[in-house]
């Protein structure tokens, strides 16, 4: 009886974590688009997100609800290059959402396997992709090309940011894995270092982009009031959901299998598209949406083909656990914290 009740409670907890992760992941890109639409200061917006995550991790750590590595300058110096790459990925992502719709963001986010496959073959001397993997990459590329060709809101500025985002997020995916392997930090330690260092980097970009002059001009024009009601609510939601996806992402990854986590991530993309279409008119044309779905489906095929391509080897239990931990950190840290889907 008690065993049955325990299993029931565990299942309920797991379901709650998965639902929480799905809601945060599917809503975050749309919420960020709302935030940047009503609060057109990408540098300040991301700084508020970093501040929220940093303070939340610190307070939860002080209360004993989570455990994170202490902040030390020696570790910070080692982690700084990864934090810069992380900041650039979030910076380009926010500016992409500033100039383009959510669908364009998802298309370019889905193109990352193509760049990773090319980089692995050219720079790391990895073998050419299998037929199934190659076919999946072709589907991704075809969907992306079709989307761009039918995008009625195409602008050079938006697609310049899209290309910059594609390069930085691909670099981050590779580089964060390298940093995780060489700097021993737990999950919440990574969250703390990523966001605190990014918060320190933010003022540099405020001055380089000239955004600080826009903020001061808006403050003087609005008598010190920078937030309108819509802006305040969307920015607050963006900050809260940015932190929640860190928590639910890590917790859900621990509670379910890697395959189930991947499937959940794919479903989240479809939910994002549906939500974006339902709430307003800032989305792609019907033909563009079909091309977007092709790109997402190609990404699903790529993920499955890569799993099939992996050789089955006998490894020790210790090595297996370490590999799973590194894979978990690699999947969850890049592109998830504070701002992106």
Swiss-Prot record:
GO terms for molecular function: antiporter activity; GDP-fucose transmembrane transporter activity. Pfam families: TPT. It is a multi-pass membrane protein. It comes from the Eukaryota. The keyword Protein transport does not apply. GO terms for biological process: nucleotide-sugar transmembrane transport. The chain crosses the membrane at residues 17-37, 41-61, 71-91, 103-123, 132-152, 156-176, 187-207, 231-251, 260-280, 283-303. Signal peptide: none annotated. Ubiquitous. Keywords: Antiport, Golgi apparatus, Membrane, Sugar transport, Transmembrane, Transmembrane helix, Transport. InterPro entries: Sugar_P_trans_dom, TPT_transporter. Its main location: Golgi. Belongs to the nucleotide-sugar transporter family. GDP-Mannose:GMP antiporter (GMA) (TC 2.A.7.13) subfamily. RNAi plants display dwarfed phenotype with severe developmental growth defects. Cell wall composition of the RNAi plants shows a considerable reduction of the fucose content. GFT1 down-regulation also has an impact on the levels of protein fucosylation. Acts as the major nucleotide-sugar transporter for the import of GDP-Fucose into the Golgi lumen. Transports GDP-Fucose in a strict counter-exchange mode. Is required for proper plant growth and development. Also acts as a GDP-mannose transporter that may be involved in the import of GDP-mannose from the cytoplasm into the Golgi lumen. This is GDP-fucose transporter 1. It comes from Arabidopsis thaliana. The lineage of its organism: Eukaryota, Viridiplantae, Streptophyta, Embryophyta, Tracheophyta. The gene is GFT1.
């Amino acid at each position: 009886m008690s065993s049955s009740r325990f299993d029931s409670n565990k299942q309920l907890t797991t379901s709650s974590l998965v639902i929480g992760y799905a809601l945060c992941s599917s809503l975050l890109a749309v919420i960020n688009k709302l935030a940047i639409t009503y609060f057109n200061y990408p540098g300040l917006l991301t700084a508020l997100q970093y501040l929220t995550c940093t303070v939340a991790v610190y307070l939860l750590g002080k209360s004993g609800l989570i455990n994170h590595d202490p902040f030390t300058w020696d570790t910070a110096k080692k982690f700084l290059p990864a934090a810069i790459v992380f900041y650039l990925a979030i910076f380009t992502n926010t500016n992409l959402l500033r100039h383009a719709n959510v669908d364009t963001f998802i298309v370019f986010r889905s193109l990352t396997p193509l760049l990773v496959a090319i980089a692995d073959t050219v720079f790391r001397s990895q073998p050419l992709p299998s037929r199934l993997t190659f076919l999946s990459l072709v589907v991704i590329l075809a969907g992306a090309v079709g989307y761009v060709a039918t995008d009625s809101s195409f602008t050079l500025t938006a697609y310049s940011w899209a290309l910059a985002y594609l390069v930085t997020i691909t670099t981050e995916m590779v580089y964060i894995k390298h940093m995780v392997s060489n700097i021993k930090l737990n999950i919440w330690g990574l969250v703390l270092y990523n966001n605190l260092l990014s918060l320190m980097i933010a003022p540099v970009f405020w001055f380089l982009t000239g955004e600080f002059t826009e903020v001061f001009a808006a403050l003087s024009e609005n008598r010190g009031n920078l937030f309108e009601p819509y802006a305040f609510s969307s920015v607050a939601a963006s900050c809260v959901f940015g932190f929640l996806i860190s928590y639910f992402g890590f917790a859900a990854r621990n509670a379910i299998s890697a395959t189930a986590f991947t499937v959940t991530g794919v479903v989240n993309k479809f939910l994002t598209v549906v939500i974006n279409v339902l709430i307003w008119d800032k989305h792609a044309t019907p033909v563009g949406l079909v091309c977007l779905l092709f790109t997402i489906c190609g990404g699903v095929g790529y993920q499955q083909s890569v799993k099939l391509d992996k050789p089955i080897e006998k490894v020790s239990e210790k090595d297996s656990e370490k590999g799973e931990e590194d894979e978990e950190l690699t999947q969850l840290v890049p592109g998830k914290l504070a701002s992106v889907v």
